[in-house]
Amino acid sequence: VTGMAIAQNNTNSPYTRYGYGDLSDQSFGNSKAMGGIAFGLRDGAQINPLNPASYTAIDSLTFIFEGGVSLQNMNISGSGVKLNAKNSSFDYLAMQFRLHPRIAMSIGLLPFSNVGYSVSDTQAATDPTTGNTADYARSYTGDGGLHQLYAGVGVKVLKNLSVGVNASYFWGDINRTRVLYFPSVSGAYNYNHQSVASVSSYKLDFGAQYTFDINKKHSVTIGAIYSPKLKLGNDYSVTTQMVSNSTGTAVSTTTLKPDATFEVPNTFGAGFTYNYDKRLTVGLDYSLQQWSKTKFDVNTSDEAVREDFNETYTYCNRHKVS
């Protein structure tokens, strides 16, 4: 018998059991409305933090304050069980303004990832000594996520060329719990396993844009971005407990705080937009996140802790075309 429960969080996905969870789409409203393109997008009335070079499009009389929330409706099915999950989440909050005829700035708060799941199932186990069969249940829950507070500057170095950089403080906590228990066996001991990863660091993101003015009505903007690989400062702990099913008290508790390594990858991106008379904009973006070259490691002699860590933090490269 298998069951599934969904936690109320910023996301409702069992896939967030792995890695940093569901990686957030950090594009803003204008970019989302165009399928997620951002690297070549340049609009003086919109904030585009995915390419800080775009900040210079704002004029001296404009101050932009923008926020976003999202609503999610998800249908999940598995092992004959169908569930519907609804949730809402904060997406972003940012402002943008001109500092100088050639310099503009943006400040904002973005989510980087979200973790939220609660999955359980029930299995049958046979005692090899007595031959008796008893049901046991497994429960997997998780919550948390990573966040990014940025301040960015764009500089118009030439008439048609702008460059920019975002400096960000990066932080968050991810909690994951795994429980194995025997609901119908009074003398059994239940097993609880909880891992907590708290990370923080600073990161830089770079961007550039060049605009070709074909004539008064037609223009093309080419953009590129780069984010270097980053090692995150962290505190990682694992707590395991054996809990008496009859009394509900822990008979043993072990807490480990091994040295762990967490990273975010090199990110490369390029794109372009074509604009006609400020009435029509079309574009294309490509990005690559080199997750396969990031390092996730835990230094411990406890094989169970090491296997759980390696299973949780395994990534492949992420390609995106918008």
Regions found by a protein language model. Give the residues of each.
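Outer-membrane beta-barrel porins/channels
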Residues: 8-33, 80, 98-322
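Short hydrophobic "helix-edge" motifs at membrane interfaces and signal-peptide entry regions
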Residues: 40-42, 148-149
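Transmembrane beta-strand segments of Gram-negative outer membrane beta-barrel proteins
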Residues: 13-38, 56-75
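Outer-membrane beta-barrel translocator/receptor signature
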Residues: 41-122
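Sec/Tat signal peptide C-region and signal peptidase I cleavage site
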Residues: 3-7
